[in-house]
């Protein structure tokens, strides 16, 4: 467009040219970033699956008549995959199935792991000797937690310790003649050393009032790493066996973080451990030659080095299960190689030896699993085929009933808890079934699982009596709780010592503003004695813990640590429809909505003009005068 002189009607000013140049730079920069991102994505290591994606046989009961029938351990359709660099040998770990924790072995390249110990007890904390011939582990097969030795050639198991109390977490010396382990005695953990030949008395390595636990023996033989709270926080310490004086050295010195699970690299030059304090555990590695310079490798706990030191295997937890993953030990990129495992996956050890033959022999002794309980449901009642409620005999609760789909699971859990704890923990409940119109404590929601008949809440009076401890666990921005119940017998024959600091809800009422805002604080000291992990026990029978509600820091009941639900894969609405017709789930209106009535708005009325001219006339008011009061006559 031009003017009458043939010149452009609009000439761009300097600001317009600057704006156009800036816009062109933004467009070119965006294109360059897109090209660079595509090149970067093409060069990033892709996540690699473990040679098997076959799940370990689950311990969760289903709603069938035989809820825990054991599936085949080896999938018929699974095919071995080529192992990635640094993967060879055999992984040995503990995992929970059919209500018990036992040892499992996974040969790299096989489609699935195999169970190698069996029985109505728990086996865990496996450690393979340097020659791949024996496995040291902890077990409560005789009631108390002791150390045992499994001969892989003969399958023979012999006891290394037979003491009242607790021993666990063994680790081998490089020559295979000694085992270091943790023992709970006089109210705290200490590190001991035991000759495998049992020709000498155990040697006490640490003797400190604070907890010393989780030992790991240096492959070079002269150092033992362990976790200690002697400096206030939980740090990684190093014990030099050649220095009787000034033997212990704090390697981490992190007041704001806690560390655990130390593991030496095969050549002893690096140490892997776990850092806590970010809302999730982080696998960290650090060289031991000079000042500690740690590098985060990924999320997880219980790290184990591959035989060549190129890969770190670890356990990655979710609220209800675990899986084995691994990370490249040298490099910024992680390779996840996990297969899913149900619940409570424990300590991992990695040996360079192919233990296929002894593992197959041990796995051949496996027997058919006995179901933890049998489900017997009545025929659905009513026109909608809804499930009925069943009374819970001997249980005290406002409504001692549960859905017919889960009542057998609860009764079996109650009986198991009685055996494990030595007292009837589930005989009294705060809630079992809650009617659709029954009020719940402040902080709980209308869509609570207690309304479904599939959930229960144990009595909080046990918490007030000091028989319950809860440990906070965060997953993906949600807060969960692990519940520990104190055993009736405190001689070590029931339960085990606590290893983590429980949460103190009462701290928010003690005048600390930070504790009030956070809904409490961790207890400074771990309570003494022996406890049973009730969260794990409930999961054996299909009862899951629930996440805390967003209001839990304000409302105590919103923490929901005492509520457990048997979902059977159902969401809340589907579970409610097992008991109620759809019309009953419409949110009720608590009162009739008022209908607004229109009201006339009064308008000001003008004052007549003649009233505006009237001036008020003052009215005289007589002023009272004082009078003289005559004096009385004498």
Task: Mark where each language-model region is.
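Extracellular/periplasmic catalytic domains that process cell-envelope and extracellular macromolecules
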Residues: 85, 447-453, 555-557
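Short, surface-exposed glycine/acidic/tryptophan-bearing loops
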Residues: 438-459
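Second-shell loop/turn segments in exported
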Residues: 392-404, 443-445, 515-527
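Sequence signature of WD/YWTD-type beta-propeller architectures
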Residues: 2-7, 12-376, 628-632
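Active-site acidic/histidine clusters and adjacent loop/turn architecture
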Residues: 350-430
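Acidic helix-start/capping segments at beta-turn-to-alpha-helix junctions
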Residues: 422-444, 551-558
């Amino acid at each position: 467009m031009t003017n009458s002189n043939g010149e452009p009607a609009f000439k761009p000013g300097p600001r317009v040219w600057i704006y156009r140049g800036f816009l062109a730079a933004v467009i070119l920069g965006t294109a360059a970033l897109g090209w660079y991102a595509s090149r970067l994505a093409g060069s990033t290591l892709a996540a690699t699956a473990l040679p098997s994606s076959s799940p370990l046989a689950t311990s969760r009961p289903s709603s069938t008549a035989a809820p825990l029938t054991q599936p085949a351990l080896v999938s018929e359709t699974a095919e071995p995959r080529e192992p990635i660099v640094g993967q060879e040998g055999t992984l040995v770990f503990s995992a929970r199935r059919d209500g018990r924790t036992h040892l499992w072995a996974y040969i790299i390249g096989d489609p699935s792991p195999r169970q190698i110990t069996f029985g109505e007890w728990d086996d865990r904390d496996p450690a393979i000797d340097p020659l791949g011939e024996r496995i040291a582990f902890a077990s409560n097969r005789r009631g108390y937690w002791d150390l045992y030795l499994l001969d892989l050639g003969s399958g023979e198991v012999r006891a290394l310790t037979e003491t009242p109390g607790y021993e666990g977490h063994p680790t081998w010396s490089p020559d295979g003649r000694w085992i270091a382990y943790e023992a709970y005695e006089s109210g705290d953990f200490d590190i001991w050393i035991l000759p495998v030949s049992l020709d000498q008395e155990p040697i006490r390595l640490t003797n400190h009032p604070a907890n010393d636990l989780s030992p790991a023996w240096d492959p070079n033989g002269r150092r033992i790493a362990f976790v200690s709270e002697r400096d206030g926080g939980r740090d990684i310490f190093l014990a030099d066996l050649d220095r009787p004086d000034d033997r212990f050295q704090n390697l981490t010195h992190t007041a704001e973080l806690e560390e655990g699970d130390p593991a030496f690299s095969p050549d002893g030059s690096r140490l892997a451990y776990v850092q806590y304090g970010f809302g999730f555990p982080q696998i960290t590695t650090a060289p031991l030659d000079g000042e500690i310079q740690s590098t985060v490798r990924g999320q997880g706990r219980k790290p184990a080095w591959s035989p060549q030191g190129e890969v770190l295997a670890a356990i990655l937890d979710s609220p209800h299960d675990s899986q084995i993953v691994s990370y490249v030990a040298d490099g910024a990129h992680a390779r996840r190689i996990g297969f899913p495992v149900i619940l409570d996956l424990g300590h991992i050890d990695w040996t360079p030896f192919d233990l296929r033959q002894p593992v197959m022999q041990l796995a051949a002794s496996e027997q058919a699993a006995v179901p933890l309980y049998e489900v017997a449901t009545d025929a659905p009642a009513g026109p909608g085929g809804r499930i009925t409620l069943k009374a819970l005999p001997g249980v005290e609760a406002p409504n001692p009933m549960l859905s017919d789909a889960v009542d057998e699971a609860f009764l079996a859990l109650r009986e198991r808890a009685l055996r494990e704890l030595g007292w009837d923990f589930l005989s009294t409940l705060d809630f079992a079934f809650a009617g659709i119109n029954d009020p719940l404590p402040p902080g709980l929601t209308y869509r609570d699982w207690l309304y479904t008949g599939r959930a229960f809440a144990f009595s909080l009076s046990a918490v007030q009596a000091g028989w319950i401890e809860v440990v906070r666990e965060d997953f993906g921005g949600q807060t969960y709780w692990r519940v520990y119940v104190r055993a009736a017998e405190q001689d070590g024959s029931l339960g085990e010592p606590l290893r983590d600091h429980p949460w103190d809800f009462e701290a928010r009422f003690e005048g600390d503003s930070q504790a009030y805002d956070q809904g409490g604080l961790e207890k400074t000291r771990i309570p003494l004695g022996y406890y049973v992990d009730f969260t794990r026990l409930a999961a054996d029978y299909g009862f899951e813990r629930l996440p805390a509600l967003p209001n839990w820091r304000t409302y105590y009941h919103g923490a929901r640590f005492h509520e457990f639900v048997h979902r059977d894969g159902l969401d809340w609405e589907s579970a409610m429809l097992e008991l109620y017709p759809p019309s009953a789930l419409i949110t009720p209106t608590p009162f009739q909505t008022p209908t607004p009535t229109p009201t006339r708005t009064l308008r000001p009325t003008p004052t007549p003009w003649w009233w505006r001219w009237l001036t008020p006339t003052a009215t005289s008011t007589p002023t009272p005068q004082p009078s003289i009061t005559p004096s009385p006559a004498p």
